[in-house]
Amino acid sequence: MPAPVVYYIRHGETAWNAIGRLQGTQDIALNELGHRQAIHAGDVLAGLLTRDGRDRHLLPFVASPLGRARATMELVRGALDLPPQDYAIDDRLREIAYGAWEGSTLAEAQARDPELYGRRLVDKWNVAAPGGESYAAVQARVSDWYRGLAGDTVAVAHGGTARALMVSLGFETPQSAADLFIEQGAVYVFNDGGQTKHV
């Protein structure tokens, strides 16, 4: 049986994304650009589902519990002419927790915790922010989510969970994924053949 195909969308931009603040588990709303990105991702997804012969009415849709992911999901589903709120929530898709660094820019985090910041710079996958979690921990919960999929799925979540999924599926290494930019307004397709990005 082939591995499930995941159509993965990162949430649209927020005010904190725009100014480089670490969001983590904070619930920051989409900004105007973020709304447009979400609708665009829905349009891109519609084309991909048509290309792949998938019935949008039969595919499961699942989102992170954070508001920016849920708002993006509802805009995506609206673009697909589906009931906006008819989707599942899975806590394993929540963003990496940055603990005490949430709300800070990277420069502010470095000024506050220079020693830990330096260690994390060297090993971003395994070193967590104070009171936060490591990418390795995120990878464990995202891997658990993926193993439980019964079939092809549309997921809306975060940059951190995308990186963790890419490593879980063997498409990236922890070193390559740690600094990988995950685009907003795009659809990433993960399948047996690898990963592709569609904008």
Question: What is the meaning of each model-derived region?
Answer:
Residues 6, 59, 148-160:
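Generic beta-sheet signal
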Residues 7, 13-82, 112, 133:
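Active-site-proximal alpha-helix that buttresses catalytic centers in soluble enzyme cores
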Residues 14, 161-162:
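Short active-site segment of divalent metal-dependent hydrolases/proteases
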Residues 63-66, 92, 157-160:
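Short, well-ordered beta-to-alpha junction loops that form the rim of enzyme active sites
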Residues 75, 164-168:
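Active-site signature of alpha/beta-hydrolase-fold catalytic machinery across serine-
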Residues 78-141, 191, 199:
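Phosphate-handling substructures
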Residues 136, 172-198:
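Domain-level recognition of soluble alpha/beta enzyme cores
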Residues 143-151, 190:
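Alpha-helix C-terminal capping segments
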